[in-house]
Each structure stands twice: as C-alpha cells, then as structure tokens.
Amino acid sequence: LIVEPLVLGAGGMLMYPASVLAELKKITEASGSLLIADEVMTGWGRTGTMFACEQASISPDILCTSKGLTGGTIPLAVTLVTDAIFRAHYSEDRKKTFFHSSSYTANPIACAAALANVEIWRDEPVAGRITALSVMQAVGLQRFRDNPYF
C-alpha cells in the first residue's frame, strides 16, 4: 500500500488524521503486505514532525523522501527500507544486487547539501522551532475559525 502520510498532495492537499495512517499500518501488517510512505512532500518537518509517519507512531516498510532532504536547495531522493527488506535484496552477486538508483541520487553536491541539512536537524532545535511556529499560526488563525468564507 502506497500512501502520502497525513496529506494527500496529489489529491488536492486533502488532510486525514494520524489514526487513519496507524490503521493502514495495522491492515498491511495483518495482510502481510508492505506499507510504503511517500514522504517526498510531507517529510522534513512539513507536518510538524521530521516525518509525518511519526505522528501516527508507525514505521513504514519503505519510506521515500526528497525535496526537504537538501533543504530544498538541489534535487536529491532517498528510499529507506527496513533491515529485513534490505537483507532480502542485498548480495555481492550482481544478479541479486539491491538496485537502488534514480536520476536524483549520488550527486556529490546534492549529497553535501543533504548532509548539511541533516547536521542542522541534529545540532539545532529545528523541531522546537517548528512547534513554536505551529502554535503561533494556530493562534493567528483562530480569528478566522467562525468565518464561513475562510
């Protein structure tokens, strides 16, 4: 099952609660299928946590991320998988190699930008700043709460 966690960007920015994402994870586990989270748009703090899946307290089997990985400076994409999936595909034998490539991987400049971004997330209070901004925005939006045109 492939999902955009919490925000269906391709569907016109439709939001759904974290409880739905948690239930989807239960369904995939019960059916023996994989949950693939497309966090290209939702990752790197855009939903309030580093990854939207965190809000449902779930770990997808496969997580795809891009855009925010480099702080939006240069294209780079990454696909993260569980250890079990990686081990099932990894081999020194070229016939069983874990092929992982695309047009947005391995650019040294993009990788340097991503590393700098990861260091910022590690060393600076980015999550705290996101929380503070979220609270400030929520307070500011309260005046529109009862406005039927907003």
List each model region and its residues.
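Conserved N-terminal phosphate-binding loop of PLP-dependent enzymes in the Aspartate aminotransferase
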Residues: 2-150
